[in-house]
Amino acid sequence: MLPRPSSRFLSTQRGPGRAVKKLIAIGEKWKQKTTRGPPKQGTLNNRSKYILCQFPYPSGVLHIGHLRVYVISDSLNRFYKQRGYNVIHPMGWDAFGLPAENAAIERGINPAIWTRDNIAKMKQQMESMLANFDWDREVTTCDPEYYKFTQWIFLKLFENGLAYRKEAEINWDPVDKTVLANEQVDAQGRSWRSGAIVEKKQLKQWFLGITKFAPKLRKHLNQLKDWPSNVKQMQKNWIGESIGAELVFKVADSKFENLIVFTTRPETLFAVQYVALALDHPIVQKYSEVIPDLKEFLQKSDQLPSDTKEGFRLPDIKAVNPLTKEELPIFAAPYVISSYGTAPSAVMGCPGHDSRDFEFWQQNCPGEHIKTCIAPFFDDASKTSEKERQKIIDTVPFTSADGILTKESGEYSGVFTAVARKSIMGKLHSKGLSKNIIRYRIRDWLISRQRYWGTPIPIIHCDNCGPVPVPESDLPVKLPELKGLDTKGNPLSTIDEFVNVACPSCGSPAKRETDTMDTFIDSSWYYFRFLDPKNTSKPFDREIASEHMPVDIYIGGVEHAILHLLYSRFIAKFLGSINAWDDPTGIFEPFRKLVTQGMVQGKTYVDPDSGKFLTPDELTFVKDPSDGNTTIIKSNGKIPMVSYEKMSKSKHNGADPNECILRHGADATRAHILFQSPIADALNWDESKIVGIERWLQKVLCLTKNILGLEKNLAISKDYKTPTDLNDAEVKFHNDFQRFLKSITESFEVHLSLNTVISDYMKLTNLLESALKKSEVRKEMMVQNLQKLVTIIYPAVPSISEEAAELISSQMEWNQYRWPEVERTTESKFKKFQIVVNGRVKFMYTADKDFLKSGRDAVIETLLKLPEGRMYLMNKKIKKFVMKYNVISFLFHK
């Protein structure tokens, strides 16, 4: 009889009963060891593995989304350590930024104090979830020891002509009173943080020349094989590569130089009807000084929707088509992207062959004729009817890039578009009126912020010398300490002792730059600093960075696809270009494999009548025998509408991970969040389903006690190998175990399918439990495979693994952290043979799989010794006898 399972580990559904409290206590018992102690880093051929999750902003509270990222990261960290890698798994704090500054204003304190308090709270929360980080590598971006080197990177950019200051139209957040980069304004024209409608202003600002790296940023995306395709596509779209031509349109007014107009379709020149200029184009700016209506149009342009087709026709000025010599009207048009490429932005308008140009022409020149110069081409094999053909021909605009030029195209009439494009470019090029070019939509990175809580820009403005870089020996330029902040905006400009300095170049009185840097600069290089965090002379050692970069696995949200990830790629490539690190591939990409986890969504309850989002206090949760739990609205007795949506305070659907850990324990919470959904998918958070995880964890502990209780003095060597003389049950047990072990190992190493890891853990536990009940597998094999189970659950549920390992270690010596190798599956030495008499199976006989090789006489003799053999075979005259595969067939004379 099997030992009775300990009642301490029996499941309960009534709150945190004794068994669940035991799980919680186990997490507390092993917290110190699992977060700070073993396993030691391996020495597997000195291979390293750099696993990094995006470091958080220290708000003071970890939400479920944080928990998901850190559990994924920590599980991979533990797995690779068990596999023998020297794992780098650091954590730090993205500590500068508006939230800290705004919170400090509300509380009347220095943001540094608020930030430090929050970091302490969040470190405790990370430990409560048993996260094992390399705290000796911890960095905080608001520490002068860190931002000293953020300033050093800025100076290197400045030295290489990639940091510059110019007056530009900028995005102004009227709530937070600061400048926003283009990437920080959403499609509705709102600030990414405050949600305010963004205004346009002209200010002198600092920019970083990311556009110089646009070709490499675009090209190298194709080499990032382990990045999600949607992230790469978003970056491709943002970089916006356009292969086209710059055409010279002369201006029929000698006061202005020629217009450089960009187009991707020079074959449409015969149908061009206007030229559109960006609002910051020099011609537009010049005319705005003398035309009040244009000035007013420019001032109100920031209030127009992003897809506006409004335009302002410039009077008394025409552009000359370089091919047809026709004079064309010129418009100021908000849809033209400012500074599109190297030349001021100008595009040609072709209403007959471009949908946007068509809408613009209809709005600004209603009723005027629309020209076309390209028609669709139908070959003889086309099955398109004449009626359908005419309908296509009459459709305006005709936007296909493939077609045939019409009679309006003069000498090019009847020529295919691709041929005409090449010929037209050659003709214009011979006259000095065109050149092939690749342009990019991306614009230089605006980094100036008019706020206090950020990295000071290390520049001094001198009337004699202009912008002068702060000498490296004077870094860091420290933020002056403030007792408290009482207003939004930039307080640095009001602090005389900070602003007024001597020029480092000529010694004259000068003023320090009072803008601080965009916080995305801080996070654009932190993965380098983690590798050498105590270095006081440089950001990081070149050899150390070259050895461990790029990051092997980088985990974080897809919401950073354009901002953080693009900026990090730019800075990594720049640092490579100045020989700060070496990449044998030559592409200097910072992240080899990118893992973007799905959003965690909360259960949302809505009143079907009013549409109101309901709080838990407004609901009654009752048990329904027919279909489980039912939720009822207290006020009207109705059943609410239920859905899963992004967690928010307004929808009352948030979840506190700390409360979940307090109710169920860290291990159950970790396994639950891994089990609920594949990493890339949205996770619908439902805490009620965690009971299945709790039962499994209790089963693991109970199973450990029961297997060890088979024989008190049972002990096996730590070098114990799977026996070769396995019976059928042992063969099946061994093969099933190896199949699950292989699946789990590959789920970590190859597929990153951590939800199936938890599922396979459960199946392995059930496999051991079933074998224990049947008593068909020898005790030594049971213990050996129990050890393996306890070892491989360590990445996901470390304290349960430690608890079970402690029970095992009390009876025998073993290496509880070394990941087991997958063994070959085996075949049974025995085979079941069908004994067929006159065409019918009479009985089965199990024998050595080589039984038939003993020969006819030996086989018959053996079978006749069996009771069934004597019954069906004795005293019969054999007419025909066949032995084949697993069949022994007798045909007797009647």
From Swiss-Prot:
A motif ('KMSKS' region) lies at residues 646-650. One of its GO terms (cellular component) is mitochondrial matrix. GO terms for biological process: leucyl-tRNA aminoacylation; mitochondrial translation. CDD domains: LeuRS_core. It holds the Pfam family tRNA-synt_1_2. ATP binds at K649. This is Leucine--tRNA ligase, mitochondrial. The keyword Transit peptide applies. NCBIfam families: leuS_bact. It catalyses: tRNA(Leu) + L-leucine + ATP = L-leucyl-tRNA(Leu) + AMP + diphosphate. It is an enzyme of class 6 (ligase). Residues 1-9 form a transit peptide. Its EC number is 6.1.1.4. Belongs to the class-I aminoacyl-tRNA synthetase family. A motif ('HIGH' region) lies at residues 56-66. GO terms for molecular function: aminoacyl-tRNA deacylase activity; ATP binding; leucine-tRNA ligase activity. Keywords: Aminoacyl-tRNA synthetase, ATP-binding, Ligase, Mitochondrion, Nucleotide-binding, Protein biosynthesis, Transit peptide. It comes from Saccharomyces paradoxus.
